[in-house]
UniProtKB/Swiss-Prot annotation:
The keyword S-adenosyl-L-methionine applies. GO terms for biological process: 7-methylguanosine mRNA capping; methylation. Its EC number is 2.1.1.296. It comes from Danio rerio (Zebrafish). This is Cap-specific mRNA (nucleoside-2'-O-)-methyltransferase 2. It comes from the Eukaryota.
Amino acid sequence: MNRGRGVRKRNAPEKASILETCDEEIRAEVAQLFNKVRSYVPPAGEKWTLPDPNVVLCDPHVSHPRLQALKHSLNEVKNQLSDKDLSVWHQHTCFTNRAGTVTSHLRSTTNAELCTQAWAKFYEILGTFQLLPDSALKTGELNSIHLCEAPGAFISALNHFLKTSSLHCDWNWIANTLNPYYEANGRGCTITDDRLIVHTLPWWFFGSDNTGDIMLQKHLLELPRFVSNMRSVDLVTADGSFDCQGDPGEQERLVAPLQHCEAICALLLLGTGGSFVLKMFTLFEHSSVCLLYLLACCFRSVNIFKPGTSKSGNSELYIVCLDYQAKEQIRPLLSKLIRNYGPDLASTASLFPRRCIPDSFLSQHEEICTFFQALQVNTIQENLRLFVCMSTEQRRRLEQLREYAAEFYTKRFSVQYLPRKSWVCRGGVVRWVKVCERKQMGSLNQRKEMELQGWKQRLAQGNYGPFIEKHLVAAEGCEVVLNGPLDECDLGAWFALEGAALPKVCSSIFCDQEMLDFLNEALEGNLRVKTVNWSLKALPTCSSCSSDSPVSILSEICSHPDVTSCLVLGSQSWCDDKLTGVRIQPEFLQGPSYCGVQNVTMHDGQPDYQLELLNAVLFALQKQDQGSTLVIPLSSALTRFTSGLVFTLHLCFRYITFRCLSGWPPAALVCMGFSPPSALPSLLDFLQNVMEKMKKVELGRQVLQFVPLEELLRGELPHFLSSFNTAVIRQQLHMLIQLDQST
């Protein structure tokens, strides 16, 4: 063999960067993509001033003909999308989006943490504007507050910017969002992605009622105390919105109250010279005119910016306000706004009368709206044309544009590599990943038609239909095992967390959210469920399903050779017959009474039920002998409170499993092999204190949690709870289908 013979293999020439090889037309288009900005500037010799507080919130809303014409024209174009399947259209517009590959490029080249579209947008804002005040950078202390921030991409983007830009400062941040762990927060407004939140909980402000709702006046007044350790607030961001896909033409009007609350919060918190970034959408309504005029009177520079990484076909805009100058002048007006603060702010009366808006400001505003409306209309029309037919050449050019835009972004904004040790969450990703959020499917017209259908029809047409409707050939639960006892935990970190009483369990981090939505709708809509004398015990059993009964479960447990004793948290009536042919007889201990018809969507969130359950578990743990078994009938474990009790049992037993039942409650926890931890006396004392606190909690409030979330979300517990709740919800939905068919 000739191995080389002194001949060196030539290296292939490096591929030239697309930044060097693409044509001028592509360069110009991408440069324009990242240059969509307009500013408000008072005419020479004119000063825009704040209106007198006495005229604030006094006059009815008015409409501006030119702006309404722009709105009508835009909605006419958007109406052409009403028959487009949302998932298909989304896939198409992702490809036509010139900046569509920026985030994937950043992930692979810069190691950006939580690199979402929001990350790219905020990094672009940081690279376009002098957002961080010079005064903060000179003193070496930067303080930022991030409203409506979930999942946390603005925070991770700012961290990346600071760590890679040689800006040496002590950065402190606080964030707020609707609490993804508060069980009464629905999914229409709440972002459940908690990848950053779960690692940084002490820095998140959820308010005294634990909801995280920044539109509550008491939370507005509590927030300054929460950030009181900050010398001055230098930056406030507000990225709030909620699902408007059911009425996309009125997105601006629907989100306006939230935007007003975000702006008032920023004006209250910011120090002189600070910056404010506010997400808005179209700016056609008088409410938007007033809000922008307020900001223009308070900041030296107010800019309307459409990031290149924001999809060009949507209405999203960012208001970038620099150098807060009206900290003292705005106090009287701000006091009135704070007195009227809440979800109805500016809904019935306009912030300012039309006469207080200078013509020079309104003229600039109309020009700005015309500019951004034209960009959006042109994008939608192009997407519609390409949706019908896209040539090979058009596809090739789009691919070039996307590749060039990704390289251009990285170079233009100097995005550098950041090692993982410099991330906000240095520990990396959380071990427990919840089920993904629901994606809207079908066209707008189809979704409106589906809204008119009953839950059964929508369930049958969706992905869950076969799973819910199938009959069980074997009892559920015994194959799911939570092994323990858990290692010792830090009881010193446990505390009883109070908040607003739950009116309904709308969400849970320990279940499939869409299945819970279906169950709540089914329970609320079923005529027999609404009947005063109806009880959940009336749910029929399915003759085609294989399921366990309390008798069969207890017979199996009490015949097991390793079981020395068995305690059941429930009255003798739960098990209809006396067990025969078993080694031992179970002992029954009075358990909780199960909530009646008026609380069908409270599940395990009813405070009285939780108190009874805690009392029963506390008493049972005191009666347990080494190696004994505990059986707990349960309706569900959706809440943090009940999950905390399961965690407590996880500390004390060798393993826990569950069984679904043919009756009510729909399942039972089976805790095998009592093995008390050394800290059991302290644990029992703590639970006793929680119980005493629950008895004294004031009206309208509730103990929501007593085990830290960091504990609840580690190890195998979340998977066990999710399996348990999924099985319980599936069974109840299956039974409710049978109930409907029998009527």
